[in-house]
């Protein structure tokens, strides 16, 4: 026999309890429909998404084709280039080395990469630029790895776009200058993360890719993740990629090597492997595997905003806004976004037609993971072929912003009150 609740608060709690799972399920179903609609609207050839909540089974759904010419559908094995989300792995590697006593974040970068002494710094000594400033994009280095770009396909015949060797980057350092007083403001720099990759290699004695595999991918069980070109047994699952300009769809080079820029944009992985990464980021603090990869206190340090992640005079875009015009701060390799007093952590990625997002709700133990294989330039003119560029058009800004806002405003709140399996034990 049912008894009457002893108070209104009890009645509300019971009602919430009955609603938690159905309400959350309804929100993810509505999000799935919105996801399909947004990708169709932007002419995306193929993509995938996963939602992770605690240690519950991930919700995954897939859209369109991995390869348009053969109509090979996207599935759980499809591998994407995660582009600048790689920077979060690089930041974790630097923090690992710090926690192991190999470096301090306030060490001068030139101590580990002496070639930087050739850079022109009109604001002081190059010795004043720290590893911390490289992590927070506040060291004053330019964005692209090369100091120039090609403006059309005709002028790009000297590609591949990205340098393949450190010696090519080092040769440009005497012609590189610091653009502003280091530490004074934020300016996104792919080049800075190339230098961080060099620090990891020189301290560990391993190639960057080998270090990340040993210290992050393998411990987390990310067995289908890799750098550079796909190993033979995974080639069939590599997604093609495209630039779209109106009705014109331009295929991008397939299975490309990101060269010396691998530490800022080289990670390739399927959605399920990125689910494993997301579980690490939102995981149970009591699970010993997380301290093996990175102490939770160090991860929280990375998720602490250091300075506004906005260029002077910059208009809001996918990197610099959230719901209600909220503006992010830059942490150590991660962006930190406060929306109505609630903290979200994220990073985007764009390269060679691929576009991606990793969005984390630490307090709610939830994460959203997005990857698509098409960059919608929003331009009516033919798309420029930029095979491996980090400076191609600001890709899929509206798409990512829409997905991010849907998660923050609707999906994450629906799951925030739903206990994880670990919490119910």
What are these regions (language model features)?
Residues 306-319, 370, 375-425:
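Short, gly/Ser/Thr-rich active-site loops of penicillin-recognizing serine hydrolases
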Residues 10-20:
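Bacterial N-terminal signal peptides
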